[in-house]
Design a protein with these regions (language model features):
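Sec-dependent signal peptide recognition
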Residues: 2-9
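Short, charged, solvent-exposed linker or helix-capping segments at domain edges/interfaces
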Residues: 185, 307-308, 436
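Conserved Radical SAM active-site core
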Residues: 95-123, 128, 132, 168-292, ...
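Conserved AdoMet/S-adenosylmethionine-binding subsite of the radical SAM
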Residues: 223-401, 405
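Auxiliary Fe-S-binding modules of radical SAM enzymes
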Residues: 11, 15, 20-167, 328-337, ...
Length: 438
């Protein structure tokens, strides 16, 4: 949704008969507001401010005794502007993480280098608006906070250990600094039941799904820390942290709707990726409607080898391939690219026969411009000492074979390995001690 479309939606909602509130004496208004707040509190728990769309937030602010109109469009926009920049909308005195950049996502999509934005002047919400949020029975606080942060100086990667307010569970998200931009890797579950042989999170086993509020809290924290640390613009977002996104599809779908809204978190869907091992063809079919780029963590192109690496997988690679092809066909033409990911392991899936098998898997179902193969050298994990990453020479040879087969192919550099923040390493010792270890 564009910013203009969002504004038109806000105006339409506020102009509707449901948004009309007849003039009543001030005392009566306050009494009614208190009664309505009490009823709302009884009927349903509050939602985090991060998961309330601007048009709904405008109506909610309009219910406050401090409201000047029944639909507070401008105040809702100021709240979301603060959220987008990493400010705390409940704290009008938040000093703001003033250094850093915001940048233009359009320019970044076109490959331009974006200069740093001017330093901010503090929070974007007034004390009045902060009070309106604080006293609302329907608006809840941000659902998570950073428990600990660690830094890999060699790569500039920063891991945030995030404690969830609901039950104290821990998840991780990672800020990855590139040359002219920053990427954020977020989690969708506590633990993961897919049990990939090379993944530390899979070793934790199944914990629980994250709520929409908890997913979006990671996004907000990423924006907040990127600004505090004066990182390049945070414009890339990937669901490649803890958990299998398609096993928590309803929450991931709802979170993505706000992540990619121009008047909410304002990430481009071209720069937002949902990565999955594809639990089933049905999961993949449902994935097609997501406002994000799709990525398939295939890891091996033959069933025998893939089931050793992903032991919970019960569907053939051909079934899953056809499901991805159908999902892409249902999307708009400009969103029909699939990223195919392989975690390369020495002597396991990095040979010439593995490259040929991948080409033979992809070629019948996809055109050249639909596929980007991304090779990820495995990062070491304590529970699988016999597995190690493919050598640079093996990765380059695999890449050349894929190029010769007619598909684009990149080799991802490892980042965050020193701080156990790289792909496959997102597992918290505290969570393992809490009983998620099999």
């Amino acid at each position: 949704m564009t910013a203009r479309a969002g504004l038109l939606l806000l105006l339409a909602v506020c102009a509707s008969p449901l948004a009309f509130r007849p003039a009543v004496p001030r005392l009566a208004t306050r009494a009614s507001a208190r009664h309505a707040a009490t009823q709302a509190e009884v009927e349903s728990p509050p939602r985090s401010v991060l998961s309330i769309p601007p048009e709904e937030l405008a109506l909610e602010l309009g219910r406050s005794p401090l409201a000047s109109r029944p639909c507070e469009t401008t105040k809702a926009a100021s709240v979301w502007h603060a959220i987008r920049q990493g400010y705390d909308p409940f704290d009008a005195d938040d000093p703001g993480l003033r250094s850093g950049t915001v940048g233009s996502r359009v320019a970044l999509e076109e490959g331009a280098t974006v200069a740093a934005a001017p330093a901010g002047k503090g929070n974007f919400v007034s004390r009045r608006v902060a009070t309106m949020l604080e006293t609302s029975a329907r608006v809840g606080p941000i659902a998570a906070a950073v428990e600990h942060e660690s830094y890999d100086a060699a790569s500039g990667t920063r891991k945030l250990l995030v404690r969830l307010r609901a039950d104290g569970a821990l998840v991780e998200c990672v800020l990855i600094r590139m040359h002219a931009r920053t990427s954020l890797c977020v989690s969708s579950q506590v633990g993961c039941r897919m049990a990939c042989a090379f993944c530390a999170t899979g070793r934790m086993g199944e914990g629980r799904d994250l709520s929409v509020d908890e997913i979006l809290a990671q996004v907000w924290l990423g924006r907040r820390y990127a600004r505090r640390l004066a990182l390049p613009p945070l414009v890339n977002l990937v669901f490649m942290g803890m958990g299998e996104p398609l096993n928590n599809l309803p929450a991931v779908r709802e979170a993505l709707a706000l992540i990619t809204r121009a008047d909410a978190f304002d990430f481009s869907r071209k720069l937002t990726i949902v990565s999955t091992v594809a639990p089933s063809p049905q999961h993949v079919a449902a994935m097609g409607a997501l406002p994000a780029k799709l990525a398939w963590s295939v890891h091996a192109a033959t069933d025998a080898k893939r089931r050793r690496l992903v032991p919970t997988q019960s569907h053939s690679v051909f079934e899953l391939r056809d499901a991805f092809a159908a999902a892409l066909a249902a999307r708009a033409k400009r969103h029909r690219q699939l990223v195919v990911e392989l975690t390369l392991m020495d002597g396991v899936n990095d040979g010439a026969d593995d490259a040929r098998a991948l080409i033979e898997l992809l070629r019948p179902a996809f055109s050249r411009d639909q596929i980007l193969v991304n090779l990820i050298p495995m990062n070491s994990v304590a529970h699988a000492p016999s597995l190690r990453g493919a050598s640079r020479d093996a990765a380059r040879a695999f890449q050349r074979a894929i190029w010769d087969g007619g598909f684009l192919c990149t080799v991802r550099g490892t980042k965050g390995d020193d701080e156990a923040a790289a792909c496959g390493q997102l597992s918290t010792k505290a969570a393992m001690r809490a009983g998620f270890s099999p």
